[in-house]
Curated annotation (Swiss-Prot):
Keywords: Coiled coil, Host-virus interaction, Inhibition of host DNA replication by virus, Modulation of host cell cycle by virus. It comes from Staphylococcus phage Twort (strain DSM 17442 / HER 48). The keyword Coiled coil applies. Residues 19-73 form a coiled coil. This is Gene product 168.
């Protein structure tokens, strides 16, 4: 992603110097936005997966503690 960001900024400064047409800059900006959206979606998915795993672990701990309590009460 960093490479693409650098490429975008380099192209943008090339455009500001009058060497690039507006349509190609617009296409490059759209491509950059799409990459950012993909990265955001992946980060959300990774976070959701991590939270699911932590919840499963918490449930396992609670269930094992309940079993210990049941054994003590008997």
């Amino acid at each position: 992603m960093l490479f693409f960001k650098e490429k975008f900024y380099n192209e943008l400064s090339y455009y500001r110097g009058g060497h690039k047409d507006l349509e190609s800059m617009f296409e490059l900006a759209l491509e950059y936005i799409e990459k950012l959206e993909e990265e955001d979606e992946q980060q959300v998915t990774d976070y959701e997966n991590a939270m699911e795993e932590e919840l499963r672990d918490a449930v396992d701990v609670i269930e094992s503690q309940l079993e210990i309590i049941k054994d003590i009460v008997r």
